[in-house]
């Protein structure tokens, strides 16, 4: 069973007429975000290029939460289009428009039309660290090994 939190959502003028973000299945983790580009001016994302795509939405998250902007697997698998800074983080105190940085890793140009589902947004609790400076860290079996040090 999932936990529900209240998130205030503001639809900006250029998102009028678009559906609000929605979970596509009962157990979905992410709400689909849509492109709020003009109907008569779709955005063409050439191969190897990236763009900041507007959603026309702003949110107010409850304290202690974040929103993560993540890729949609279908866009990545079928077209090579993904979220460049995945996951993008929306902090609880941010009130600006949610925009998605999409990059086209595919061979062909990709056209983003108004209302196209371009990313998903996952709401998650946040844990803030209390940093404690120390002279040395506790020892572990792994130590400083990284970047494939545990095998393939």
Swiss-Prot record:
Q: In which pathway does it act?
A: Pyrimidine metabolism; dUMP biosynthesis; dUMP from dCTP (dUTP route): step 2/2
Recorded hits in InterPro entries, A to Z, give: dUTPase, dUTPase-like, dUTPase-like_sf, dUTPase_trimeric
* Pfam families recorded: dUTPase
An example GO BP is: dUTP catabolic process
Q: What is catalyzed by this enzyme? A: dUTP + H2O = dUMP + diphosphate + H(+)
Official protein name in the record? Deoxyuridine 5'-triphosphate nucleotidohydrolase
Source organism, top-level taxon = Bacteria
Q: What class of enzyme is it?
A: hydrolase
Q: Which cofactor does it need?
A: Mg(2+)
Q: Could you tell me the EC number(s) of this protein? A: 3.6.1.23
Of which family is this protein a member?
A: Belongs to the dUTPase family.
Keywords, comma-separated and alphabetical:
Hydrolase, Magnesium, Metal-binding, Nucleotide metabolism
Q: Does the keyword Hydrolase apply?
A: yes
Q: Where does substrate bind?
A: 72-74, 85, 89-91, 99
Magnesium: present as a keyword of the record? yes
GO MF terms here are: dUTP diphosphatase activity; magnesium ion binding
Function (record text): This enzyme is involved in nucleotide metabolism: it produces dUMP, the immediate precursor of thymidine nucleotides and it decreases the intracellular concentration of dUTP so that uracil cannot be incorporated into DNA.
């Amino acid at each position: 069973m999932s936990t529900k939190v209240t998130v205030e959502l503001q639809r900006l003028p250029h998102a009028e007429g678009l559906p609000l973000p929605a979970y596509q299945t009962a157990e979905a983790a992410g709400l689909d975000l849509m492109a709020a580009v003009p109907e008569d001016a779709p955005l063409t994302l050439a191969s190897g290029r990236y763009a900041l795509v507007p959603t026309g939405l702003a949110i107010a998250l409850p304290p202690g939460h974040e929103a993560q902007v993540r890729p949609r697997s279908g866009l990545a698998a079928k077209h090579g289009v993904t979220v460049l800074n995945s996951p993008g983080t929306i902090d609880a105190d941010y009130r600006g428009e949610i925009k998605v940085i999409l990059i086209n890793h595919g061979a062909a140009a990709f056209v983003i039309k108004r209302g196209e589902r371009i990313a998903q947004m996952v709401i998650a609790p946040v844990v803030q660290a209390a940093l404690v400076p120390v002279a040395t860290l506790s020892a572990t079996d792994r130590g400083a090994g990284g970047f494939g040090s545990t095998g393939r």
